[in-house]
Design a protein with these regions (language model features):
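Predominantly flavin-linked oxidoreductase catalytic cores and closely associated redox partners
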Residues: 3, 13, 83-204, 212-215
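Glycine-rich FAD pyrophosphate-binding loop
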Residues: 1-5, 12-32
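Short, solvent-exposed loop/turn segments at secondary-structure boundaries
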Residues: 30-34, 72-73, 171, 218-222
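C-terminal helical "tail/cap" subdomain of flavin- and related membrane-associated enzymes
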Residues: 235-303
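A conserved beta-strand/loop capping segment in the N-terminal third of enzymes
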Residues: 35-84, 90-94
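Conserved mid-domain beta->alpha element of the FAD-binding
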Residues: 166, 196-259
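A short, flexible beta-alpha/helix-coil linker loop
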Residues: 27, 65-67, 212-215
């Protein structure tokens, strides 16, 4: 139940089970920044045609100070991927499926039996940050720029150059528009919305995606957790629930740790930025795993 990237990517990988996807939305295809690791992309099991760009470097700035990160990241064209995946499975848009139990749903007054997997997305409850992203004409760069500001507590801004456009945005609490970097290019479009910032939640039965609040606390990225749960859910459907339960425990431990780190950084935001960037200014750090960018930076800022 749910036709976002979580539900559609899972259905794509479970095609031999003949899954049915119910989606409240009119049509699939959400716009997002879509920066993920190569590790995450590999586990989605989709074609490389959905990769718009590859990045080997991130520059993180605070005032006139910089920290460089060696990375291995990809830009996933999530909008096009969702549209294409919806065409290869039984996909029903504009359909509100009410989950009655892990084995039953209610669709337009009719009860349907079967294994229910919740991919219904975030319910809007709990803490959230606001995000806005502007799409401009392309610039000549292959480096992602991340900007931290004293007044944007717990948030950041970004510039992501792609071959055919440039993604420029900001997220944080309150009005984040003033933190969006200026770009001397023609504006093409604007999109955005709220992003959950919460600890992982308990959900009865099988679930995947933002319904679990399994998103990176600092950036709000959730595709990584989708990729990690695809294979464990398959094993659970085949009769072995242990891998799913173990992966949930692992995700919960890491995400809740991230939540605590970010909460600590928010309480001493200005001090953390000044101290951290004074110690790491001009240095280059290597990021090898999915959470390292956040754990590495925030951990060093706080210690």
């Amino acid at each position: 139940v749910g036709g976002g990237i979580a539900g559609l990517a899972l259905a794509h990988n479970l095609r031999d089970f003949d899954p049915v996807v119910f989606d409240r939305r009119r049509f699939p295809g959400k716009k997002c920044t879509g920066i993920i690791s190569r590790w995450t992309f590999t586990r989605l099991n989709v074609s490389k045609e959905y990769v718009d760009a590859e990045f080997k470097e991130i520059v993180m700035r605070y005032g006139n100070r910089e920290i460089h990160f060696n990375v291995d990241l990809l830009r996933l064209n999530r909008e096009r991927l969702e549209r294409d995946l919806s065409g290869e499975v039984k996909y029903y848009p504009l359909t509100n499926a009410e989950v009655v139990s892990p084995k039953e749903i209610l669709v337009r007054g009719e009860r349907l039996d079967g294994t229910v997997i919740k991919a219904t997305g975030w319910d809007g409850k709990g803490r959230k940050v606001n995000a806005i992203e502007m799409v401009y004409e392309p610039i000549d760069s292959d480096v992602i720029t991340v900007i931290l500001h004293e007044e944007n507590v717990g948030g950041f801004s970004w510039v992501v150059p792609l071959p055919d456009k440039t993604l420029v945005g900001a997220l944080g609490y309150g009005d984040v528009f003033r933190f969006v970097p200026k770009l001397d290019r023609r504006l093409i479009e604007v999109h955005g919305g709220p992003i959950p910032r919460c600890k992982m939640r308990e959900v009865e039965g099988l679930a995947i995606g933002d319904v679990l609040c399994s998103v990176k606390t600092f950036t709000g990225g959730g595709i990584f957790s989708v990729s990690r749960l695809i294979e464990p859910i398959r094993k659970s459907l085949e009769g072995d629930p242990r891998a799913y339960e173990e992966e949930l425990r692992s995700l919960r431990k890491e995400i809740n740790r991230q939540y605590r780190l970010v909460s600590m950084a928010e309480r001493a935001w200005r001090t953390s930025l000044r101290l951290g960037f004074s110690l790491l200014d001009g240095k280059t750090l290597s990021v090898g795993e999915e959470f390292d960018l956040h754990s590495l930076l925030l951990g060093r800022l706080l210690h």
